[in-house]
Amino acid sequence: MATTYEEFSAKLDRLDQEFNRKMQEQNAKFFADKPDESTLSPEMREHYEKFERMIKEHTEKFNKKMHEHSEHFKQKFAELLEQQKAAQYPSK
């Protein structure tokens, strides 16, 4: 069964969205376990804030990198389709 570029692209987009959603769910679960800020010392509050920022930054970077990989795969797939088309229908 041949896969079209649109099908391939849509599948990668769905996977990117699903991955992003799962990362957000994991982060939400993690942040939900944070103790009440009123019970934290200023040092621990600062520690939690830095850690939350770091997790959010890493999540954003990772999601961006996954999206970049997907775009690269889409480009390569389009190139392969063009090569296949050229091989099947060589110009005279």
Curated annotation (Swiss-Prot):
Belongs to the KMP-11 family. It is found in: Cytoplasm, Cytoskeleton. InterPro entries: KMP11. This is Kinetoplastid membrane protein 11. A minor in vivo processed fragment (IVP) also exists, probably as a result of proteolysis. Probably O-glycosylated. Contains equimolar amounts of galactosamine, galactose, glucose and mannose. May be involved in the regulation of the cytoskeleton through interaction with the subpellicular microtubules. May be involved in parasite mobility and attachment to the surface of the host cell. Strongly stimulates T-cell proliferation and is thought to play a role in the immunology of leishmaniasis. The keyword Glycoprotein applies. The modification Omega-N-methylarginine is found at R45. Monomer. Keywords: Cytoplasm, Cytoskeleton, Glycoprotein, Methylation, Microtubule. GO terms for cellular component: cytoplasm; microtubule; microtubule cytoskeleton. It comes from Leishmania donovani. GO terms for biological process: cytoskeleton organization; defense response; positive regulation of cell population proliferation.
